[in-house]
């Protein structure tokens, strides 16, 4: 019986039990991308390392994780998806335990690399498993479950990491993965299975010579890019020779890889899928949403902690509220996507996010309180719920089911790369715009100007009443005005970047016209309508 006329495959166990099983490990993996952020000072102190050295605890994980994402589809096909997924869970769980035991920073970084390798295959594997386990008409709800894990985990990561570190020890942010990983291994072995068409593809691939050149090129390109994005701001970007050289290396490796993969009969990553308009547009959306989602996830706690003096746990709570709001919306969108044109849902989502960002730009100030921070994050993620599920659905439209691994792998990769680029660009833009605004404000608040004199005189009188001498009061007043200018200039940098993001998201709406809607087909991929 040919693939075209093969009866629809159904798993032996309830699809929802399978969905919950594969979501557990994915949730812990995504959680680990952010849970260590607030624990870095404790890790550095415990292991006698500087802040710059301890930052490699994050960078090492992100680099190895990013390398595995695009090649996970190839590895799934070669090894077998279930076997590959279980190997990833086992490696992630074991390396998490070893991270907790690490006696030195060097050993911790090494184990974090292994943890990133194991974790990199979990997101795309889960998405592919869900796509094959559920019929096309029910994928919306399945992807809603996946979305809960991907969105909630980074939102609560800093809060959970701060709470664990404050109440126990930083090593427990790694130990908590172990029992969940063991449970995931047991349930996966029991419930998950590879569909027949995937097994046939695996047998076919075994007789084909592996594309080691493509594998080497994409590894070099992604590792170089991730290091540039993570260390660029710290090294003054292209003012640093090694950042410039690494950027050139990454660009050339990507270009050569694209040409090589395009002409290779059995590539590691099937980039010819970008010839399909739905797939290409969905990946563009995934990349852009990654910029905004991860960028704002970086911006809000950064502003609350640095400019407003919030503790890390409290800043993390501002993100968690939005994550819980999205969890409430995802099942609703999952149900709507089979009844409403997904493109209309995405248009509503883009407009909602853009409006939320615009509102955020109007209230983002040094007087913003916690409730306002919670509200603006909730407005953003409310709109994102209307994009996440439909975008995942439309990415599969018209693509053979044998390519499900490739779709899920590339989707996760584009979102994560967009996030890395977004954080780097946003961080740099805030700094550069802030410097420009500070120069402008200093020029208009120089000694002698009425505004400057009124402010410094008022502060000086207050300090004198508190016991400071006239000279000390004047000097301290000048310092306080300078610090206020710095904070206000930085805030303006945030506001301008947020406004730019609002325009970018709104500009995505016309691109929906490129996509063709899906019409669920029984037992096969959704077909184009």
Predicted regions and their residues:
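Residue-level hotspots within transmembrane alpha-helices of multi-pass secondary transporters
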Residues: 38, 70-71, 155, 159, ...
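C-terminal membrane-cytosol helix-exit motif in multi-pass small-molecule transporters
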Residues: 179-198, 219-230, 249-263, 509-516
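Transmembrane core module of solute transporters
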Residues: 13-79, 85, 100, 106-109, ...
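Helix-loop-helix hairpins in multi-pass membrane proteins, especially solute transporters
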Residues: 69-214, 324
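Hydrophobic transmembrane architecture of multi-pass small-molecule transporters
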Residues: 2, 53, 416-517, 526-529
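Small-residue-rich alpha-helical segments with characteristic i,i+4
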Residues: 143, 152-158, 162, 373-457
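Short, Lys/Arg-rich, polar N-terminal cytosolic tail immediately upstream
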Residues: 1-10
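Structural signature of transmembrane alpha-helices in multi-pass secondary transporters
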Residues: 29, 58-61, 65, 92, ...
């Amino acid at each position: 019986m040919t693939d075209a006329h093969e009866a629809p495959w159904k798993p032996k166990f309830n699809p929802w039990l399978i969905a919950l099983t594969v979501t557990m490990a994915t949730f812990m993996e995504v959680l680990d991308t952010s849970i260590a952020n607030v624990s870095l000072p404790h890790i550095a102190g415990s292991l006698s390392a500087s802040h710059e050295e301890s930052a490699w605890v994050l960078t090492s994980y992100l680099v190895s994780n990013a390398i595995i994402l695009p090649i996970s589809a190839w590895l799934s096909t070669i090894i077998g998806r279930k076997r590959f997924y279980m190997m990833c869970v086992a490696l992630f769980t074991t390396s998490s335990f070893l991270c907790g035991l690490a006696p030195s920073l060097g050993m911790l970084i090494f184990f974090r690399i292994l943890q990133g390798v194991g974790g990199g295959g979990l997101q795309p594997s889960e998405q592919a498993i869900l796509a094959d386990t559920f019929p096309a008409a029910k994928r919306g709800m399945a992807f809603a479950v996946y979305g809960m894990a991907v969105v909630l985990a980074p939102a609560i990561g800093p809060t959970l990491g701060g709470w664990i570190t404050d109440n126990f020890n930083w090593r427990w942010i790694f130990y908590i993965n172990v029992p969940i990983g063991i449970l995931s291994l047991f349930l996966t072995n029991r419930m998950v299975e590879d569909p027949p068409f995937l097994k046939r593809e695996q047998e076919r691939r075994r007789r084909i010579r592996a594309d080691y050149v493509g594998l080497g090129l994409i590894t070099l390109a992604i590792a170089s890019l991730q290091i540039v994005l993570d260390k660029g701001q710290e090294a003054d970007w292209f003012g640093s020779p090694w950042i410039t050289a690494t950027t050139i290396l990454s660009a050339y490796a990507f270009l050569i890889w694209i040409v090589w993969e395009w002409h290779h009969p059995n590539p590691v990553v099937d980039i010819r899928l970008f010839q399909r308009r739905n797939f290409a547009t969905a990946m563009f959306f995934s990349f852009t949403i990654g910029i905004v989602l991860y960028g704002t996830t970086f911006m809000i706690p950064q502003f609350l902690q640095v400019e407003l003096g919030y503790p890390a746990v409290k800043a993390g709570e501002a993100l968690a509220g939005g994550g819980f709001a999205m969890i409430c919306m995802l099942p609703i969108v999952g149900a709507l996507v089979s009844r409403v044109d997904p493109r209309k849902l995405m248009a509503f989502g883009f407009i909602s996010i853009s409006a939320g960002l615009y509102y955020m730009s109007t209230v983002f100030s040094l007087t913003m309180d916690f409730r306002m921070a919670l509200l603006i994050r909730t407005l953003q993620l409310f709109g994102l719920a209307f994009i996440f599920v439909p975008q995942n659905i439309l990415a599969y439209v018209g693509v053979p089911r044998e390519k499900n691994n490739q779709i899920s792998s590339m989707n996760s990769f584009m979102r994560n790369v967009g996030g890395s680029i977004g954080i780097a660009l946003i961080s740099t833009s805030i700094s550069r715009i802030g410097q420009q605004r500070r120069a402008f404000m200093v020029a208009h608040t120089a000694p002698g100007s009425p505004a400057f004199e009124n402010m410094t005189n008022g502060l000086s009188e207050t300090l004198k009443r508190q016991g400071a001498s006239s000279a000390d009061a004047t000097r301290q007043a000048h310092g306080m005005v300078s610090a206020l200018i710095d904070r206000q200039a930085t805030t303006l940098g945030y506001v301008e970047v947020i406004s730019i993001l609002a325009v970018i998201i709104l500009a995505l709406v016309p691109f929906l016209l490129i996509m063709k809607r899906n019409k669920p087909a029984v037992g096969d991929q959704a077909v184009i309508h």
